[in-house]
A protein has these predicted regions:
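UBL (ubiquitin/ubiquitin-like) substrate-recognition surfaces
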Residues: 1-235
Length: 235
């Protein structure tokens, strides 16, 4: 076949947790384009200790997409192990099996640290309605988190939750709201109305209204979580 990206990765010990994440990320088109276009080179801070990981990731990705064969990611693994020692993440310093989700979190964090930069984020215009006010609050939250260290990883992998707490006491209702960034979802596996499992049912279950316990008399409290914005790559 002439199709690219059909390259396999050899395990180095029990490193299938790393290889599976590498294959998933290398087939994420937005992140792949960021690497193959060399855009990352203009943002990479070579003085940072995480830079070696990104450079070896670049080599790994190009080998995965250069020809259909089997590639041994020795240098990439060594950069992971070296950085794990520096960051006191002992689970990634050897050749033992590990959790793929934990490795993905570690890799994205290190990648972000290597290419992040301070950016200017301004809020302009006046709110015309309640939705505009919510949008401003959401953007302020986004600015607070990322104005000093924004990166392509944030752009691709981060979304925002919108959480509303409703309290009803003696017939009077009060609401509070907050925004929070996220880059991974932990979903409970849920069946749909047909008895089958699907992603939509899992997301609906994640965002259902929750009745919160309270020790106050004549008081009812509810919590509702919604997605304000979704990342381009949802994990």
């Amino acid at each position: 076949t002439n199709k690219k990206g059909l390259c396999g990765l050899r395990n180095l010990g029990n490193t299938c947790f790393m290889n599976s994440i590498a294959q998933c990320l290398s087939n994420s088109q937005e992140l792949l384009s960021y690497m193959l276009s060399n855009k990352f080179k203009g943002e990479l801070n070579e003085d940072k200790e995480e830079a070696d990981l990104v450079n070896n990731w670049n080599i790994l990705v190009r080998n995965l997409w250069h020809k259909n064969a089997t590639y041994t990611p020795n240098n990439f693994l060594r950069s992971v192990q070296s950085l794990a020692i520096m960051k006191d993440r002992g689970q990634f310093t050897g050749f033992q099996q590990n959790d793929s989700q934990e490795f993905l979190q570690f890799f994205l964090e290190m990648f972000h640290n290597a290419v992040c930069k301070e950016v200017t984020m301004d809020i302009t215009g006046k709110p015309r309605n309640d939705f505009d006010k919510m949008a401003i609050d959401a953007y302020k939250n986004y600015v607070d988190f990322f104005k000093n260290d924004y990166s392509e990883i944030v752009k691709l992998f981060y979304g925002q939750f919108f959480t509303r707490i409703k309290t009803i006491k003696d017939g009077k209702e009060e609401c509070s709201r907050s925004f929070e960034p996220f880059n991974m979802l932990s979903l409970e596996i849920s069946k749909n109305s047909d008895g089958n499992y699907d992603l939509e049912s899992c997301l609906e279950n994640f965002t259902k209204v929750e009745n919160l316990e309270t020790d106050k008399e004549n008081t009812v409290k509810y919590k509702e979580v919604k997605f304000w914005s979704l990342p381009r790559i949802l994990v």
